[in-house]
């Protein structure tokens, strides 16, 4: 069984004439690219390992040169490709923090054990994250990701227990 691959960026364009690509980082840790030696490129069903030669940053983009990509013509064919890494290469998070992709898809229950729905998305509001919980009936419940509300996150069971503030369900 192969280890799960995690999406960290998408190639949006070429950069210059030497085969570099412009990557939109899909991570809170764009500095991670400097530490990586290789990444997996995925385009549809095709996946291949490429080795990182150079890394630089321009505005909100990461500029990468791959050893296997010799020129701009080869780089042009990579537009839209996703960059992925093994889960074991993730930046470790402090205790009590979780990656969004680990939260999405988790079942949410209140403190009494009543099923509320499944986390469909996590909104970044600045002050705190908000879990978008979709019920079986299709209704959405916005649950603030606060310690006073989210009492337990069990990633192994993909289960989150919450204590909803008064009036949040209405």
From Swiss-Prot:
Swiss-Prot/TrEMBL GO biological process terms: ribosomal small subunit biogenesis; rRNA processing
Keyword Chaperone tagged: yes
Compartments, as annotated in UniProt: Cytoplasm
Superkingdom in the source lineage: Bacteria
GO molecular-function term, one example from the UniProt record: ribosome binding
Domain called PRC barrel: residue spans: 94-168
InterPro entries: PRC_barrel-like_sf, PRC_RimM, RimM, RimM_N, RimM_N_sf, Transl_B-barrel_sf
Alphabetical UniProt keywords: Chaperone, Cytoplasm, Ribosome biogenesis, rRNA processing
Keyword Cytoplasm: yes
Assigned GO CC terms: cytoplasm; ribosome
Domain remarks: The PRC barrel domain binds ribosomal protein uS19.
Task of the protein: An accessory protein needed during the final step in the assembly of 30S ribosomal subunit, possibly for assembly of the head region. Essential for efficient processing of 16S rRNA. May be needed both before and after RbfA during the maturation of 16S rRNA. It has affinity for free ribosomal 30S subunits but not for 70S ribosomes.
Family statement drawn from the similarity comment of this UniProt entry: Belongs to the RimM family.
Assembly, per entry: Binds ribosomal protein uS19.
Protein name: Ribosome maturation factor RimM
Source species: Desulforudis audaxviator (strain MP104C)
Encoding gene (name): rimM
């Amino acid at each position: 069984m192969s280890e799960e691959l995690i999406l960290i960026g998408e190639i949006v364009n070429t950069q210059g004439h030497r085969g570099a690509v412009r990557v939109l980082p899909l991570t809170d840790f764009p500095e991670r690219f400097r530490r990586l030696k290789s990444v997996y490129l995925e385009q549809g069903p095709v996946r291949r390992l490429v080795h990182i030669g150079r890394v630089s940053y321009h505005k909100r983009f990461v500029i990468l040169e791959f050893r296997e990509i010799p020129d701009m013509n080869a780089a042009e064919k990579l537009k839209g490709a996703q960059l992925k890494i093994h889960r074991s290469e993730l930046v470790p998070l402090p205790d009590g923090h979780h990656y969004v992709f680990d939260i999405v898809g988790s079942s949410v229950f209140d403190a009494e054990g009543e099923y509320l729905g499944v986390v469909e998305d996590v909104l970044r509001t600045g002050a705190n994250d908000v879990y978008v919980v979709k019920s079986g009936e299709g209704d959405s419940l916005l649950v603030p990701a606060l310690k006073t509300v989210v009492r337990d996150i069990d990633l192994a069971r993909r289960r989150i227990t919450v204590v909803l503030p008064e009036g949040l369900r209405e």
